């Protein structure tokens, strides 16, 4: 999101308005291994959330009971024709990952978002994210 000072009493004005597929807040809800889906309870305190807004993403891993922080990363993203691509601008766990791009195939089924590809470590992954209501 880009903003600019209007230099008057009305404050700030949002100037970007890119709304891409998948925009919103998502909770990691499971993985697919072979043909088996394994879901996790998103009401548990350990969470990974991914926020997608105006062509930018951020993920954060945290614990809602202890307020522990496990990591974060983010940058820009695109989602079109079944391909979700992240361009990493920051990554708290390994700054050597900054500047890389990760591409995934994606499929949205109802409130679920499936994405499949290689992790930032190069390992195969097939994740399931569930849309988080405000």
Residue ranges of predicted features:
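Conserved small/polar residues in nucleotide/adenosyl-binding loops
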Residues: 1-5
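N-terminal helix-cap/turn-to-beta initiation motif at the start of protein domains
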Residues: 10-27
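An anionic, turn-rich surface loop/hairpin at beta-sheet edges
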Residues: 86-105
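Short, surface-exposed coil-to-beta transition loops
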Residues: 7, 42-46, 69-74, 98-102, ...
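A short, structured loop/turn motif at beta-sheet edges
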Residues: 16-20, 76-84, 107-112, 133
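Hydrophilic extracytoplasmic domains
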Residues: 105-134
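Short, solvent-exposed aromatic-acidic interface loops
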Residues: 8-13, 33, 64, 89-94, ...
